[in-house]
């Protein structure tokens, strides 16, 4: 039986020469290697929250959330910002009790198709069916996202709400009375996630008050294709570089990958 190793960017497959040599010397070991590797790939696809692979930038975001109240993740299109943020949010949801997280997207369409879809991708597979109980409710469709733009994770009784920047612009009182984050102040205490934030400081400043009582953190994502907005530029003002990395496409020039923003006390 011919063994076809699935291509994967992170799990290296044996070369044709190695396959031939091992197949001749120890066919059973080759088959075990094949099954183990294919099993890792399938597990990462079926349950990326618990068995998936982290990009280096995600670990930097996670570390920033441990040290600062706000983390701004910058990156180009298809750099994995949204997926990484969704994984961190779901880590907080599944590990910590009785929390409340609010997630913002540009509009209803991007909320369903991008932000809610990325959260659903990270949902543990045993909850990827309609779940309804006293302590939890999950109902999702690709067409409409989460029913009521919200879900409650049963095992932790943590609620996640999805809202849009348009909603806040039309009514800046929609967050009145809420506290976001987790009361027990865990290590990964995320209270809000703002994806592709293009607005001014109004929403961020409002959320700061809603996060303060639970000492929870704010996660923001932004794609600087056409430069920085005035609000994002505030983070960049007098920023101190904490870590650099050689840029392959720039001839190995060292570029910042982690910075500290004193203007916002953020990473």
Report the location of each language-model feature:
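Phosphate/NTP-binding elements of NTP-utilizing enzymes
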Residues: 2-267
């Amino acid at each position: 039986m011919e063994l076809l190793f699935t291509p994967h960017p992170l799990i290296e497959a044996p070369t044709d020469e190695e396959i031939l040599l091992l197949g001749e010397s120890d066919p059973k070991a080759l088959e075990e290697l094949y099954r183990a590797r294919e099993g890792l790939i399938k597990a990462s696809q079926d349950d990326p929250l618990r068995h998936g692979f982290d990009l280096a930038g995600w670990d930097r975001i996670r570390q920033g959330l441990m040290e600062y109240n706000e983390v701004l993740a910058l990156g180009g299109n298809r750099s994995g910002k949204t997926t990484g943020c969704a994984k961190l949010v779901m880590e907080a949801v599944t590990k910590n009790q009785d929390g409340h997280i609010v997630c913002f997207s540009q509009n209803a369409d991007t909320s369903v198709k991008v932000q809610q879809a990325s959260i659903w991708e990270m949902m543990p597979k045993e909850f990827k069916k309609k779940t309804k109980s006293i302590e939890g409710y999950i109902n999702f469709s690709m067409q409409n996202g989460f029913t009521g733009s919200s879900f409650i994770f049963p095992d932790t009784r943590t609620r996640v709400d999805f809202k849009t920047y348009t909603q806040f612009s039309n009514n800046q009182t929609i967050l009145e009375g809420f506290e976001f984050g987790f009361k027990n102040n865990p290590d990964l205490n995320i209270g809000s996630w703002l994806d592709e934030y293009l607005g001014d400081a109004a929403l961020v400043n409002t959320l700061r008050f809603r996060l303060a009582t639970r000492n929870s953190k704010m996660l923001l994502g932004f794609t600087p294709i056409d430069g920085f907005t005035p609000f994002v530029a505030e983070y960049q003002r007098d920023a101190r570089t904490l870590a650099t990395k050689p840029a392959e496409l720039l001839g190995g020039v060292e570029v910042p990958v982690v910075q500290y923003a004193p203007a916002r006390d953020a990473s």
